[in-house]
Amino acid sequence: MNFLSSLFKSGKAERLKQRVHAVERENERLRSIITLDQAHRARWHDLEATLDRTAIEASVTSALANAEFDDRPMPHLVLRNLLPAATYAALLEAIPPDDFFPDHDPVKQNVKLRQLEMAPAWTRRALEFLENTVIPGILTPALLARMRPYLDNATAARPHAATAGRLMLRRPGYKLEPHLDPSRVALTCLLYFARPGDDTAHGTQLFSIDRPITVDRTNTFYPRQHGYTCKRVKIIAFEPNTALVFLNRGGAHAAEIPKKAPKHTRRFAYQFYVAPEEAAVESLVSP
């Protein structure tokens, strides 16, 4: 047996290929950090100015006052012009390049800020502000105040908190069947990070369920797998600076980007949950 045959049969070649790929990705991330940090350094003062809590609170208050509410298929809100335009643009700039997203799944990729070993300075600064100030200090209290009447009495009486969220990247070929999030979740919140020119069709689909769910759904629950019938009621368009917030019961949600969509299609959104405090704390320490 020659050297190459031995190498391939032992699996060493595949492991070597994986290591080379990992090194190439790390080098690409380092190059991106250097390039982006240099570009942002000259504009840092202007970028920081967009993280204005007072302006963001006013914008969220206005978005809530003008929000589209519907109780079909489950109580939900669509908030448009959620953030000041400059803040939204600065958050779009904070989305890291693709190499910062895990690549084990080519169509479904998630990033949690606390899991990033390296990131551009503005990515870390802006997403930390989103996670540590905007979501827990502005959005969560406002959304709870608006949606609390639709929570059951036992849940509504408990203190709630936001879970640590995730930045999501989806590509053509992605398909998520109608489902409900884990039962500990009271509200599911999606912040659309649509960029200029993104196809609005790749939004969130809301489904009715033919009867009340009577089986355990501690984990993510797919009604069709348990004999329930789901019927699509509407699609919340993937529009810039828009948030979708819905009650995690009574209906299901899904999403899809068809394989035939243009290859360059990318759908960015930030998802977080609002849950009773003990459940939210558990999510903070889970991977």
Residue ranges and their predicted role:
Residues 66-147:
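Non-heme Fe(II)/2-oxoglutarate
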Residues 101-102, 188-190, 216:
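A short, polar/proline- and glycine-enriched secondary-structure boundary/capping micro-motif
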Residues 1-69:
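Fe(II)/2-oxoglutarate
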Residues 22, 26-33, 123-144, 218-229:
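N-terminal short leaders/motifs
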Residues 96, 137-211:
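Non-heme Fe(II) oxygenase catalytic core, chiefly the N-lobe of the double-stranded beta-helix
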Residues 2, 7-11, 15, 173, ...:
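Catalytic core of Fe(II)/2-oxoglutarate
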Residues 36, 46-48, 52, 91-92, ...:
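Short, Φ-rich (hydrophobic/aromatic) sequence segments
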